[in-house]
Amino acid sequence: MAKKSWIAREEKRERLYEKHKEERRRLKEEEKWVELQKLPRDSSPVRQNNRCELCGRQRGYLRKFGVCRICFRELALEGKIPGIRKASW
């Protein structure tokens, strides 16, 4: 389980991104780079990281399912993800 502070930090970045999204787009179109640099650093979409919905893990994230590899395996073995079976050959 990820630390609560890390998860809260990611949520804060998401809120800042949503708040400054239109302003950032407008400044890019007008090519006002100095004003763009004055926006908060965390309002940039590149600063956001994907996190597992269940445990908050950042690495090993599977975009298609929204969970990390460990939680994915647990859910798949429990049969909670439709259409996913353990490979056998």
Swiss-Prot record:
Q: Provide the function of this protein.
A: Binds 16S rRNA, required for the assembly of 30S particles and may also be responsible for determining the conformation of the 16S rRNA at the A site.
Cofactor(s) recorded in Swiss-Prot or TrEMBL? Zn(2+)
UniProt-recorded name of the protein: Small ribosomal subunit protein uS14
Citing just one GO molecular function, the answer is: rRNA binding
What domain of life does the native source organism fall in? Answer: Bacteria
Q: Give GO cellular component annotations, separated by semicolons.
A: cytoplasm; small ribosomal subunit
| Alphabetized InterPro entries for the sequence | Ribosomal_uS14 (IPR001209), Ribosomal_uS14_bac/plastid (IPR023036), Ribosomal_uS14_bact (IPR023053), Ribosomal_uS14_CS (IPR018271), Ribosomal_uS14_sf (IPR043140)
Q: How is the cofactor bound?
A: Binds 1 zinc ion per subunit.
Record bears the keyword Cell membrane: no
Q: Which UniProt keywords apply?
A: Metal-binding, Ribonucleoprotein, Ribosomal protein, RNA-binding, rRNA-binding, Zinc
Single biological process term from Gene Ontology: translation
PROSITE patterns tied to this protein: RIBOSOMAL_S14
Q: Which family does it belong to?
A: Belongs to the universal ribosomal protein uS14 family.
What Pfam families does this protein's entry cite? Ribosomal_S14
Provide the assembly information: Part of the 30S ribosomal subunit. Contacts proteins S3 and S10.
Answer yes or no on keyword Nucleotidyltransferase: no
Q: Which residues bind Zn(2+)?
A: C52, C55, C68, C71
Which NCBIfam families does the UniProt record give? PRK08061.1, PRK08881.1
Q: Coiled-coil ranges per the record?
A: none
